Amino acid sequence: MESPSARTLGNSLGDDSGNGNENGNGSGNGNTTMMPHGIYHERQTRHLCGLHALNNLFQGPDMFSKSELDDYCTTLTPRNWLNPHRSWIGWGNYDVNVIMYALQQRNCEAVWFDRRRDPHCLNLSVIFGFILNVPAQMSLGYYIPLPFHMRHWLALRRLNGSYYNLDSKLREPKCLGTEQQFLEFLATQLQMDHELFLVLDEETDCKDKSQQRWLLPQFRD
């Protein structure tokens, strides 16, 4: 499912020279690249993987900003200090509630996919994109692992006829190949401690929401 025209990036280029807008008003996308094949890619800054995943999913630097996601945190739980939906030091680390609420503001919804199922049941033609939530090992510097884990958000999408991993930790988007290759990639991810969310465009799917259009007909309840 291709992006609606309002959600595509035009000819603007990201700034690849800085570390993001430190005043919290920008998207925090200091490490951004427009790839030669026209794919927009934000790279990791601080713990803003949720922000980068959303902007990479929608292919634009201004779809969401750090300040906007911070506002969503206080909308969901009206307090700034020790807000449960983000890092207490204000570096991001947004939880699933913020990601789902952000998608709703763009007329999309996130559907959790049961990882016990085979992803070959998915009706890829009606799915706008995918968000993966994966474990992330924390370390002190590059060498000393810390005894706790965090979670990392990343986006997956079909662009220019192929599926791509738009993980902000990658130097550039990674082509995952054809539909069949992508489904095999998802199957591998789901065998690990990874959570998959399907992103659906409510503007086109609202009439058939109860019919589980994200599944092929033979797999619907």
Swiss-Prot record:
Region (Disordered): 1-37
Domain of life: Eukaryota
GO biological process: protein deubiquitination; proteolysis
InterPro entries attached to this UniProt entry: JOSD1/2, Josephin
Gene Ontology molecular function, alphabetical: cysteine-type deubiquitinase activity
TM stretches of this protein: none
Catalytic center residues: 49 (nucleophile), 152 (proton acceptor)
Keywords associated with the record: Hydrolase, Protease, Ubl conjugation pathway
EC number of the protein: 3.4.19.12
Catalysed reaction equations from the record: Thiol-dependent hydrolysis of ester, thioester, amide, peptide and isopeptide bonds formed by the C-terminal Gly of ubiquitin (a 76-residue protein attached to proteins as an intracellular targeting signal)
Domain Josephin: 36-214
Low complexity bias: start-end ranges: 9-20
Pfam family, one: Josephin
Function statement: May act as a deubiquitinating enzyme.
UniProt cross-references to PANTHER family, sorted A to Z: JOSEPHIN 1, 2, JOSEPHIN-LIKE PROTEIN
Protein name in the entry: Josephin-like protein
